[in-house]
């Protein structure tokens, strides 16, 4: 580009920045545009599948799946991770079903979690917009899109038809929200349910409520499915969960992650590190025996999980080796999950 064109471009950029503020126009190669900050999901395998070490800040994320698949559990783990790194989180509970005892067990600081239980969809999305615009929130969870009932539907009669009202509400709200979300670097998570399309002979009959707008505006879409129940004898301990990254604008999509969600305690971090460690050949598996370097970890998956829980230094070492292999930021003892979990236990014992 010749000098005159460069001067003209610089003058235009200066004028735009004067009118609309610094950062309103920029070169794509600038460092702060390329670096996408992330919040961990609490699952090492899911952080790897997402490609950047977690969900992106300043973007819209949709988590969808069947009932009791672990959607809210994943969202609560993201809140816990954001709070551990000094962030502030909000939970818009449109379903009026948030369990504070379970949230606390997952590591959420419920004393500092901002919660709203709105009456209408409009109220929920206005609260969401106000929190995003404040610039003080790191992550907002809306649970769920299906429960964002338009005011006209709530005030109407039970049998009235309200075709397309919710889709219109979501489309309008997302048009307003998307710019503010990006500027404030607030990760906004919408949890969504599944519905069946009527009369579909071929292809996937499953769809998500709330229209198509959320699919378009989301930078990341996570499909959460329960694949099996974890049992020990006759006792049900939890469920094996598979998450597929069906859309990803910040890294290659279609990657999958599997982890255990244990009843009452959420994602089993030790089990997740064990699985990823075996997949990456950092932990050796021979029959039902597991070993790391010269250390015998134990026989049977549940026993090894218990061993890793009791030996946080080995767990952290394995985790950091996995992180290095996938070009993710390593952890030190202070911010490791196990330390946090043990600190919580010791607080409760006191």
Curated annotation (Swiss-Prot):
| Job of this protein | Can catalyze the hydrolysis of ATP in the presence of single-stranded DNA, the ATP-dependent uptake of single-stranded DNA by duplex DNA, and the ATP-dependent hybridization of homologous single-stranded DNAs. It interacts with LexA causing its activation and leading to its autocatalytic cleavage.
HAMAP family assigned: RecA (MF_00268)
Q: Which of this chain's residues are annotated to bind ATP?
A: 65-72
Q: Pfam families this protein is in?
A: RecA, RecA_C
What is the name attached to this protein's record? Protein RecA
The GO terms this record gives for MF are: ATP binding; ATP hydrolysis activity; ATP-dependent DNA damage sensor activity; damaged DNA binding; single-stranded DNA binding
What family does this chain come from, according to its entry? Belongs to the RecA family.
* CDD domains noted in UniProt: RecA (cd00983)
Any one of the GO CC terms: cytosol
GO terms of biological process kind: DNA recombination; DNA repair; SOS response
Which keywords accompany this UniProt record?
ATP-binding, Cytoplasm, DNA damage, DNA recombination, DNA repair, DNA-binding, Nucleotide-binding, SOS response
* Keyword Nucleotide-binding attributed: yes
Q: What are the top taxonomic ranks of the organism? A: Bacteria, Bacillati, Bacillota, Clostridia, Eubacteriales
PANTHER family (UniProt xref)? MITOCHONDRIAL DNA REPAIR PROTEIN RECA HOMOLOG-RELATED, RECA
The UniProt regions of compositional bias labelled Basic and acidic residues, in chain numbering, are 340-350
Region of interest: Disordered = 326-350
Location of this chain's protein in the cell: Cytoplasm
